[in-house]
Amino acid sequence: MAKAVWVHALVDVPEGVEVEVEGSKVKVRGPKGELERDFSHAKGIRIRVVEEEGKKQVLVETFFANRKRKALVNTVAAHIKNMITGVTKGWRYKMKIVFSHFPISVKVVGDRVEIHNFIGEKAPRVAKVLPGVTVKVQGRDVIIEGTDIEKVAQTAANIEQATKITEFDRRVFMDGIYIYAREVMS
């Protein structure tokens, strides 16, 4: 199969956002904060900031690409786009507290979420909150917000995993905390 000579992806940089590229490290600064990520694992991929007609863009490119490198170009571009969205608007995950008999109470204590009275258990279950992420409990909803989509998503996964039930039929025992919405903050 023929190899493509030049594979590239462009990511637009909006006003008020600064992007710095040093080798394989990308630093994005915006009104909501700053994110930094190292793409040194992406071998053969070059990242740079270009300016055409007064419009800044991040160019992710590779030469003589096979199938994996083509996919890697778009993956790196998507990560940079998510970083830009995070520092301009932010990310929000919404979770629902579901219970049938034993009322679950959720508290945020420092860098962890404590889940009390889950299926009548005496000891609280604990989920870790990653740095740079805020967790709020509003009634039966848990709202998770932050600039880094991966940290926000991992925190939501930690909470969902902490309420995982084993050795019971999940169709009958539906108690837990579940993700029901992922969105960009406005």
From Swiss-Prot:
SUPFAM superfamilies: Ribosomal protein L6. The gene is rpl6. Part of the 50S ribosomal subunit. Keywords: Ribonucleoprotein, Ribosomal protein, RNA-binding, rRNA-binding. One of its GO terms (molecular function) is structural constituent of ribosome. One of its GO terms (cellular component) is cytosolic large ribosomal subunit. Belongs to the universal ribosomal protein uL6 family. Gene3D superfamilies: Ribosomal protein L6, alpha-beta domain. This is Large ribosomal subunit protein uL6. This protein binds to the 23S rRNA, and is important in its secondary structure. It is located near the subunit interface in the base of the L7/L12 stalk, and near the tRNA binding site of the peptidyltransferase center. It holds the Pfam family Ribosomal_L6. GO terms for biological process: cytoplasmic translation. The keyword Zinc does not apply. PROSITE patterns: RIBOSOMAL_L6_2 (PS00700). InterPro entries: Ribosomal_uL6-like, Ribosomal_uL6-like_a/b-dom_sf, Ribosomal_uL6_a/b-dom, Ribosomal_uL6_arc, Ribosomal_uL6_CS2.
